[in-house]
Amino acid sequence: AVILLKDTTQESARIGVDLVIQGDPRLERIAGRVMRKEEIEGGRLEEVWACKEAMYKAFGPGLDFVKDLKVDFLSKDLISGMGRKWEVRRKGNTVVVLGPV
């Protein structure tokens, strides 16, 4: 989902949101094509994929998932990507990433 908001300067701000179900077997199949080695080795595929999808929804198309969408974990609930911060939320077996925050 992409949400367009008006900020105080009257310019549009794009927000990206993505939801991933933990344990989705497709993540292991696509990880090598869309994630960096260190992102895969971190063991947080759901959060990485949800963040990359949220960034792509906010700033794509034309972005490469490996080259352009690098994910770094700042804390359990905060990810850095594209020079911005992205919030991670978990509920049951669902991971939601939204931002930038």
Task: Set out the residue ranges of the language-model regions.
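Core catalytic alpha/beta fold that binds nucleotide/phospho-ligands
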Residues: 1-101
